[in-house]
UniProtKB/Swiss-Prot annotation:
A molecular function GO annotation: serine-type endopeptidase inhibitor activity
One GO cellular component term: extracellular region
Comment field on protein domains: The presence of a 'disulfide through disulfide knot' structurally defines this protein as a knottin.
Protein name per its UniProtKB record: Trypsin inhibitor 1
CDD domains associated with the record: PlantTI (cd00150)
Keywords: Disulfide bond, Knottin, Protease inhibitor, Secreted, Serine protease inhibitor
Function: Inhibits trypsin.
Lineage: Eukaryota, Viridiplantae, Streptophyta, Embryophyta, Tracheophyta
Site positions (Reactive bond): 6-7
Record bears the keyword Membrane: no
Length: 30
């Protein structure tokens, strides 16, 4: 389980996302 804050944040790449979130296919961090 990644430590990912549960906020809806748009992204283009993993580095756009906080914590250990990654950029998902739908264009949001998760």
């Amino acid at each position: 389980e990644r430590r990912c804050p549960r906020i809806l944040k748009q992204c283009k790449r993993d580095s756009d996302c906080p914590g250990e979130c990654i950029c998902m296919a739908h264009g949001f961090c998760g």
